[in-house]
């Protein structure tokens, strides 16, 4: 059996949210997509083993670096029991099993995917929220075509005309 990660080991987490994401219990507030905070493995494990695990499984926050040379990210993912959502995301994004999932993984997939690939990826309940949120953010920055926005809005049962009207107002 692999050695366990010490509860005091620092782990860098990255925000997967376009808007702010905070976790007051552990004293961090991530203001924008890609912002980073450092938590201990003990804190991250407490999140992963509680009802708050949705933050990790749905990629609101993503561990991106373990500050201990003897462990790699796959050790961390296994010890946090997050193999399933991470393996699914790697498959959808076309990443290798050792690749780290970051906010850029979502951005690159959204920009580089076809409309059909994005539509298929939105069927994954662990990815759909972040894909939707980030696609809307990229559209607002004129970085993705309206067809991708349309797919996201349809997936979320939002009318394109109403969305555009709300955005203009």
Model-derived segments and spans:
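Compact, well-ordered interaction domains used in eukaryotic information-processing assemblies
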Residues: 2-85
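Charge/polar-rich, low-complexity and marginally structured segments
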Residues: 83-169
